[in-house]
Amino acid sequence: MQDGCRPVVAIVDDDEAVRESLRFLLDVAGYDVVTFDSAQDYLDGIDRRRAVCLVVDQHMPNTTGLELLAKLRRLGTGLPTALITGSPTPDILRQAVALGVMKVLEKPLVDDALLRFLAAAAAGDGA
């Protein structure tokens, strides 16, 4: 945790129901959550130094989750990231590994897998 505060998780997903569901789950689990409805919204609005990790949807209009991560990597941001997708194709998995994604989570999400990722990211554990 940072400065004794609750860890901050950034969520980027174009589906409002998913964002709000994740916000509720993570709030109950002890995280502060900031949500964004697009990759551009995230790039424009987040103080990336505050978040301990990023949860990003792959399939969004205009910019996919992997495209957002590629932009962030070019900017030198190595924030621990989980990519969520309903179709984890071999190509998506390959690209995710190349971009340093810590975890690819398949929809529908399993809460325990997401919470394990968040705990590892908040602890600074690359596992």
Could you tell me what each predicted segment is?
Residues 49-56:
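Active-site beta3 strand of CheY-like receiver
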